[in-house]
Amino acid sequence: RGRSGFIVEFNNKYRYDLLQQVSLNQEDGISIYSKADFVFYPKNCKLKPIVVFTDGFAYHEKRVDNDSAQRMVIIKSGKFIVWSITWEDVNEFDKSKPNYLFENFLIQQEVNLKVTEKYFAEYKKYIDKTNFELLLEILKVDNYGDFEKFSLGIIAGYLKAPMELNNFIDLIPNSIK
C-alpha cells in the first residue's frame, strides 16, 4: 500500500494489512475528505476494508455533524465498512464492560426484545459486546452476511413507533425470516 503498517492475523486464517492515520478522499471514491485512525485492509478480496475511527468525547463533541457527514459518505461509497470505538471500549477490553454515560442502544426493550429474540436469536450473543469486541468478531469472518442480519436486528430494536408486533414482523423481508 506504499507505506509501513502492520499485518494482523486471526486463527492463522484471517489476515489484514493494518494502516494508521489513513486519508480517504476522491481517489478512494470519498467526496468529503476524512482521516481514519485505522484501516484494516483484508487479504480476502471478497471483503471490504474496515475503516476505524476512535472517538473521544472531548474532541468529537463539537464536530458530530462533520463526523457524521464524513462517515456517511464513506458508507455510501459502498467500498468500506465504517466502525467507531471509544477509549473505554479498548481500555476495558477483556476486563469488565465499560461504564458508558449514555444509553446503550444495543440493549433491546420489551416488544423490540421479543422481535429480536424471535427473528434474530442467533445474534443475541452479540448484544452485550462492546464495539471493540464486535470489531474483533467481524475481523474473523469470511463474509459480512451475518453481521448485516445482526444490524437489521439492531435497527428493529430502534423502532419506537407504536405498532402491533405482527405488523412489524410482516415488514421483515422473507429472506431473513
Place the predicted regions along the sequence by residue.
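Nucleic-acid endo/exonuclease domains
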Residues: 1-177
